[in-house]
């Protein structure tokens, strides 16, 4: 039984190594293209039997386009290097608008700081940031935390029942009882 388990692990290891070798081979091809596209193109010209190098050949080699995706996947180029400053600013604003609101910062639109402060204040209270700040200010022992949670849960249930009773009384009063 131990022998068969050992064989299975060897087979799975061999499969793992073959996939790693394939990935290494693909990455090495990408590295060759990115690191020295001119030499790669010259090597392909020599394979065809063309040994003469003219200005047009060099211009063709220099104008070779390497796909940006290939360069990004190899980690050789950053997308921000290809964008202009205006495009970077526009994309950062769009990304900021799509991010989740943590309640710490906002974007000031239309040069209106008063509106922005109101929005920041609303977001902070929606996320209960002042309450979290108060509750996290001092250390509380685990027993005290459990007691506080139990008290808050009881208060919440009591208030729900009390509000329901008030609604019943209002309804009865409206009906004339």
Curated annotation (Swiss-Prot):
Localization in the cell: Mitochondrion
Membrane-traversing stretches: none
InterPro entries (alphabetical): Mitoribosomal_bS21 (IPR052837), Ribosomal_bS21 (IPR001911)
GO CC aspect terms: mitochondrial inner membrane; mitochondrial small ribosomal subunit; mitochondrion
GO MF annotation list: structural constituent of ribosome
Assembly and binders: Component of the mitochondrial small ribosomal subunit (mt-SSU). Mature yeast 74S mitochondrial ribosomes consist of a small (37S) and a large (54S) subunit. The 37S small subunit contains a 15S ribosomal RNA (15S mt-rRNA) and 34 different proteins. The 54S large subunit contains a 21S rRNA (21S mt-rRNA) and 46 different proteins.
Function text: Component of the mitochondrial ribosome (mitoribosome), a dedicated translation machinery responsible for the synthesis of mitochondrial genome-encoded proteins, including at least some of the essential transmembrane subunits of the mitochondrial respiratory chain. The mitoribosomes are attached to the mitochondrial inner membrane and translation products are cotranslationally integrated into the membrane.
Further information: Present with 1270 molecules/cell in log phase SD medium.
Entry similarity comment: Belongs to the bacterial ribosomal protein bS21 family.
Protein name per its UniProtKB record: Small ribosomal subunit protein bS21m
Organism this protein belongs to: Saccharomyces cerevisiae (strain ATCC 204508 / S288c)
């Amino acid at each position: 039984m131990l022998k068969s388990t050992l064989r299975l692990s060897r087979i799975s290891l061999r499969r793992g190594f073959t996939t790693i070798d394939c990935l290494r081979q693909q990455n090495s091809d990408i590295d060759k293209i990115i690191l020295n596209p001119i030499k790669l193109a010259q090597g392909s010209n020599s394979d065809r039997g063309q040994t003469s190098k003219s200005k047009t050949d060099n211009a063709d080699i220099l104008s070779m386009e390497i796909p940006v995706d290939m360069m990004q996947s190899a980690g050789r180029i950053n997308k921000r290097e290809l964008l202009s400053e205006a495009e970077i600013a526009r994309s950062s604003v769009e990304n900021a608008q799509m991010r989740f609101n943590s309640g710490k910062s906002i974007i000031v639109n239309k040069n209106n700081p008063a509106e922005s402060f109101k929005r920041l204040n609303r977001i902070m209270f929606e996320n209960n940031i002042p309450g979290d700040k108060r509750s996290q200010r001092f250390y509380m022992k685990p027993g005290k935390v459990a007691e506080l949670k139990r008290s808050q849960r009881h208060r919440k249930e009591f208030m729900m029942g009390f509000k329901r009773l008030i609604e019943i009384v209002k309804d009865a009063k409206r009906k004339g009882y």
